[in-house]
């Protein structure tokens, strides 16, 4: 015989002992310290039980009114992006619906979140399907600044921004972002199908759209699209100042990629090399081999019709050979205080780098 049992449980507001959830949350609590959690809830449940008292077909639905939830320590370091962020994060007045059926845990909710001392809005949907976690979150940021240094992007504190994150956390600890979107006034940053390894290295990427003004008030408007195993980068304008600065501090032992071997074809109408100087019709290609830049060829023209060419190639001896020539050196060398009086003429740079050691020759004539 099988008996069907159902019921309802009502919990008044209480300060809950989070340690009681350790069997459910497994090792998630090892890196998180929760100070308190206050809530009230209404839960409906049902299950079948046989004559041997074995339970099956368990179903649980809970409407949770989360009044206060304070984390005083957590492993996420979001301070590079949110300067006011601390380990202490406070959630208030969240309405949460929880459904549990067999191997599927479904959580949906929304409410207030404090980043530092500033109040923001958060909504989320999290589905744990037998260890595979599907998430869809939206964070509205109005009272905090938002910074993305490698894109030279900064949202002013008084402006509103919407961040959407949608993806899957797989059992093998790989993370797939199906959609990352940041929207603020006329600015938009969009990333689709970004695959990260368990070490948070980029394994694959399908699409990137940049359409925003950066800290220099320069327009970045480009698109990256995947075609089979290769990529194209096309656009109206791009500020490469930050990219140039970062390349000067490059650490060849580090990489943001994993198992990455692809070719990029590039064509950009206007490319800024600093706030005031730019080139027209940048085109060429570059190739990554075993996660590192293996070959690059780029050509472009300054506004006065002077040319520049850059090539990088790694030979069979693992030497990286860089060649750069231009008949308009002024915008390229004026950033260096030790080079004065050579702003006209011809620039020829040649470098060989191996095992972190470079031998370079610079001619300005």
What are these regions (language model features)?
Residues 1-365:
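Membrane-proximal interfacial segments on either side of biological membranes
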């Amino acid at each position: 015989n099988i008996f069907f049992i159902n019921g309802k449980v009502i919990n008044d507001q209480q300060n809950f002992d989070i340690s009681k959830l350790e069997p459910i949350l497994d090792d998630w609590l090892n890196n998180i310290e929760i100070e308190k959690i206050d809530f009230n809830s209404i839960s409906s449940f049902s299950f079948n039980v046989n004559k041997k008292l074995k339970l099956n077909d368990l179903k649980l639905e809970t409407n949770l009114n989360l009044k206060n939830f304070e984390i005083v320590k957590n492993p996420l370091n979001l301070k590079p992006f949110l300067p006011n962020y601390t380990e202490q994060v406070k959630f208030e007045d969240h309405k949460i619906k929880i459904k549990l059926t067999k191997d599927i845990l479904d959580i949906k909710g929304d409410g207030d979140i404090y980043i530092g001392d500033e109040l923001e809005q958060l909504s989320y949907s999290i589905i744990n399907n037998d260890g595979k976690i599907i998430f869809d979150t939206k964070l509205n940021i109005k009272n905090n600044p938002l910074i993305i240094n490698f894109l030279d992007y900064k949202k002013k504190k008084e402006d509103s921004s919407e961040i959407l994150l949608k993806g899957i956390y797989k059992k093998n600890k790989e993370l797939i972002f199906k959609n990352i979107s940041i929207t603020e006034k006329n600015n938009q940053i969009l990333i689709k199908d970004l695959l990260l390894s368990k070490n948070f290295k980029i394994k694959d990427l399908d699409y990137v759209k940049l359409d925003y003004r950066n800290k220099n008030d320069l327009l970045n408007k480009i698109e990256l699209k995947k075609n089979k195993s290769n990529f194209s980068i096309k656009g109206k304008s791009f500020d490469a100042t930050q990219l140039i600065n970062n390349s000067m501090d490059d650490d060849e032992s580090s990489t943001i990629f994993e198992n990455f071997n692809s070719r990029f074809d590039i064509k950009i109408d206007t490319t800024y090399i600093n706030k005031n100087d730019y080139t027209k019709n940048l085109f060429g290609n570059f190739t990554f081999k075993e996660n590192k830049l293996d070959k690059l060829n780029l050509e472009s023209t300054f506004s006065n019709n002077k040319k520049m060419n850059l090539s990088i190639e790694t030979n069979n001896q693992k030497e990286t050979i860089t060649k750069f020539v231009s008949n308009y050196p002024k915008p390229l060398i004026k950033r260096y205080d030790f080079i004065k009086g050579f702003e006209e003429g011809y620039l020829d740079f040649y470098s060989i780098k191996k095992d972190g050691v470079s031998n370079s020759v610079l001619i300005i004539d």
